[in-house]
A protein has these predicted regions:
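Conserved ABC ATPase signature
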Residues: 92-96, 100
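H-loop/switch region of ABC-family ATPase nucleotide-binding domains
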Residues: 152-153
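Helix-to-loop junction immediately C-terminal to a conserved catalytic motif
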Residues: 27
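Catalytic Walker B motif of ABC-type/P-loop ATPase nucleotide-binding domains
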Residues: 117-120
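A short, surface-exposed alpha-helical micro-motif characterized by mixed small hydrophobic
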Residues: 158-160
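Conserved ABC ATPase "signature" region
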Residues: 73-88
């Protein structure tokens, strides 16, 4: 499986196929049992886990965004607007709905300005409009040379935004 510069590659597969495990291996969280992973620069990859609660350590959504933007308030607030989070800036991240939590996690990852994004079901819990906003933002990032490997069950999102898709069955692409 090769991820090219500026590409949005969606990885599809059933439950238990190994999609999340593959992302964890690519991000360095897990070691592969066999095979190997070749990186241009491993430190240039950002990982969005399926369970995003572990990403939040601050008291407010705004503080989380500022943390992701290295204190750049203009960038943080711009991302809040893009991800429809402006109405929640003073709320605690744990008080958000599932879709709002996903948007905050995606926003925080996107603010990290990584060259490779590994995203595990980022559209989970999002409404159609917010998925479209995320898809457009991801396409914009790809046009800037950022590569994205995105795990999803959302065929419509894949058809609308992916350059390519790969299928994973029992750990095999």
């Amino acid at each position: 499986l090769t991820l090219y510069k500026g590409e949005l590659l969606c990885l599809l597969g059933g439950n238990g196929a190994g999609k999340t495990t593959l992302l964890k291996i690519l991000s360095g969280i897990k070691k592969p049992w066999r095979g190997n992973v070749k990186y241009v620069r491993k430190e240039s990859a950002g990982y969005l886990p399926q369970n995003t609660q572990s990403m939040f350590i601050k008291d407010t959504v705004k503080e989380e965004l500022l943390d992701g933007a290295d204190g750049d308030e203009a960038r943080a607030l711009d991302m809040a607007e893009q991800m429809e989070l402006t109405g929640f800036l003073m709320r605690h991240p744990y008080d958000l709905s599932g879709g709002e939590t996903q948007r905050l996690a995606a926003a925080k990852l996107l603010l990290g300005q990584k060259k490779v994004l590994l995203m595990d079901e980022p559209t989970k819990g999002m409404d159609a409009w917010t998925k479209e906003q995320l898809g457009r933002h991801l396409r914009k990032l790809c046009s800037q040379g950022i590569s994205i490997l995105l795990v999803t069950h959302d065929l419509d999102f894949t058809a609308a935004y992916a350059d390519r898709c790969a299928m994973l069955f029992d750990g095999m692409v």
